[in-house]
Amino acid sequence: IRNLLEENPKKYDLSKLSRLTCGGSAPPVSLMRWYFEKLGVEMIQGWGMTETNPLGTLSRKVAKRSHLNLTEEQQFDNIAKAGLLMPGLELEIVDENWHPVPHDGDSVGELLIRGPWICAEYYNDPQPEKFHDGWLVTGDVAKIDGEEYLIIADRSKDLIKSGGEWISSVDLENHIVALNGVVQAAVVAQKHPKWDE
């Protein structure tokens, strides 16, 4: 959409557009800034999946009364996160032994979600590894900060292990897309004899 708008800036009347919702994958902050600075449009992002029917979290520049006095930079820091939990749902981040990790913005683990409309099983395909004690195991690696914002680190299958370190492909892609002249980026691991990937 951005490319279309840049190529034909006067073709579309966007004077009534104030918000744009994005889903499917997290937009880079540079794209959210562009919409706000060039068009005055707030890009709202959320996190969810088919199994959450569909929305689990939502992120806005000002999502709480306490955010009214945040600087613009702090507001963009907030919308870069996956957002705050929708009412009626519960989120938890757990380690490999199913123990909850602190909601400190640093501790990373497997994202679990539950609630009255969250998928409890797959029709004719039980997949017990996708469920644990009433929680849906999302397959996302995430953390929750002190204000209860969800921050998706990566899909567990997309993490890159290099030299004993786990590297988020999403973080790398976001840094690359923030560079001038870069529109899209994809980071894919390759096998390496010394570094693993």
Question: Which ranges hold each PLM region?
Answer:
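AMP-binding/adenylate-forming catalytic core of the ANL superfamily
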Residues: 115, 120-121, 141-197
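Conserved ANL (AMP-binding/adenylate-forming) active-site segment centered on the GW(Y/F)…HTG consensus within
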Residues: 40, 73-79, 104, 116-144, ...
